[in-house]
């Protein structure tokens, strides 16, 4: 279901929106052989023996356990089943109010929700027997039947409100914008399972065994919130001299309450030299603009939703008087000073269009300083802390040059565009706040080194 609406209530009041609903249902009976097994199982393997038993022979010899359990024909014969339903709803509603010329007040609310419900059953299945002796082959059967139920819910809400004002005359042009936004994300999940059902016909979870060893359950929840205020002003003088100023203030629930706000200003200026009087007689230059900018951005992509919390391990048993005693261990200390990573970018650029706009050149030189980078640090073993929290201790500098050339032409009615790019970049670790060299395995066998004065992520 997909519905869109838009209506001009009055000359100055407009509403718009959309509603979407998606429902997916899956109901699968019997086995679900992995389709790849149809390609992987060799043609010389016997799928089913002449005596009715499942195949265990490949090329005159007993097949490997993986080939036997991957027999697609056998997988189709079992009594496994699974059922699931996913429902997704999205509402997007907004409005525009234009009370006076040049002034627009806008609001938008977006809600997206997704709910999943699933239930699956794994039936008993006898082991495959060898063709020659009839001996069961270990690891080829399902020895305990089981049922599991899963539920999850994801909701995301985003609200935005802005006020925009435009004013211009023959010389000046001014645009001002102010706004706020709020985002709330939440994920919840539950799961439960039982084993040892007396019959494959039972489809209720309560039909399984009540013994503790046959019961299982789990769940989880995570959420975050972001509140933002922002403003921007643009000024143009005779469409030649351009200025822009921005400011953002963002607060994230991923940080402790005293350290949640980050403030990120930015400024830019441009000069369209080709609009000047002394350029009017240079016909082969269609556009020549130089520009400069400086701005900051905040980053929380490397921050977990609860990284500033103190963590405890509830399963830390210890020995007291030769007896095991239940204990609680602090596995990670609180990290109340956790804050925003900040990127400060300085850029100098030029835009050129030549020869009736057939040739375009865009070139930029940039200096990018990233500060308060989240990095781990070494903790003395005697603290007993398993996992040290990351801290905002890193500084990295990147410098580089980028240029793109585009040529547009035609041969008769055939039009073509050719684009070429060149880019260089140099970076180094500027500061680790006195921390020792940091060695990371990058999730594999290759190790990387973070050392002051060296390129970030050098091979170690």
How would you name each of these model-derived features?
Residues 35-74:
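Acidic, glycine-rich flexible loop segments
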Residues 131:
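Active-site-surrounding "flap" and adjacent substrate/cofactor-binding loops of secreted or lumenal enzymes
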Residues 4-23, 31, 66-122, 135-454, ...:
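Extracellular/periplasmic, surface-exposed regions of secreted and cell-surface proteins
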């Amino acid at each position: 279901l997909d519905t869109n609406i838009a209506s001009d209530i009055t000359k100055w009041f407009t509403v718009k929106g959309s509603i979407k609903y998606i429902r997916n249902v899956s109901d699968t009976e019997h086995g679900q052989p992995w389709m790849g097994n149809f390609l992987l199982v060799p043609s010389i393997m016997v799928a089913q023996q002449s005596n009715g038993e499942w195949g265990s022979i490949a090329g005159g010899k007993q097949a490997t356990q993986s080939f036997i359990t991957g027999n697609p024909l056998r997988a189709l014969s079992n009594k496994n089943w699974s059922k699931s339903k996913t429902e997704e709803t999205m509402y997007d509603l907004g409005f525009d109010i234009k009370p006076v010329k040049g002034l627009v007040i806008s609001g938008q609310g977006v809600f997206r929700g997704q709910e999943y419900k699933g239930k699956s059953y794994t039936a008993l299945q006898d082991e495959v027997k060898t063709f020659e002796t009839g001996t069961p082959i270990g690891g080829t059967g399902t020895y305990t039947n089981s049922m599991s139920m899963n539920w999850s819910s994801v909701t995301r809400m985003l609200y935005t409100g802005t006020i925009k004002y435009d004013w211009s005359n023959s010389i000046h042009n001014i645009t001002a914008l102010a706004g706020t936004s709020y985002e709330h994300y939440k994920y919840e999940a539950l799961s439960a399972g039982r084993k040892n059902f007396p019959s494959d016909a039972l489809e209720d979870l309560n039909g399984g065994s009540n013994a503790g060893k046959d019961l299982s359950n789990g769940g989880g929840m995570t959420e975050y919130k972001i509140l933002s205020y922002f403003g921007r002003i643009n000024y143009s003088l005779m469409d030649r001299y351009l200025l822009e100023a921005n400011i953002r203030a963002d607060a994230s629930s991923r940080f402790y309450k005293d350290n949640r706000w980050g403030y990120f200003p930015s400024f830019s200026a441009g000069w369209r030299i080709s609009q000047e009087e002394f350029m009017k007689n240079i016909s082969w230059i269609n556009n020549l603009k130089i520009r400069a900018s400086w701005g900051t951005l905040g980053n929380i992509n490397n921050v977990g939703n609860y990284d500033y919390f103190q963590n405890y391990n509830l399963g830390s048993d210890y020995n007291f008087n030769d007896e095991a005693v239940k204990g609680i261990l602090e596995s990670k200390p609180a990290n109340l000073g956790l804050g925003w990573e900040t990127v400060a970018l300085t850029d100098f650029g030029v835009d050129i269009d030549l020869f009736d706009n057939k040739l375009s050149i865009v070139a930029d030189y940039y200096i990018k300083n990233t500060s308060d980078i989240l990095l781990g640090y070494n903790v003395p073993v005697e603290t007993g802390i398993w996992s040290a929290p990351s801290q905002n201790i890193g500084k990295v500098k990147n410098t580089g040059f980028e240029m793109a050339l585009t040529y547009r032409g035609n041969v008769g009615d055939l039009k073509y565009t050719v684009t070429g790019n060149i880019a260089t970049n140099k970076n180094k670790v500027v500061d680790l706040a006195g921390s020792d060299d940091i060695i990371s395995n990058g999730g594999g066998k290759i190790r990387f080194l973070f050392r002051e004065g060296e390129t970030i992520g050098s091979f170690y």
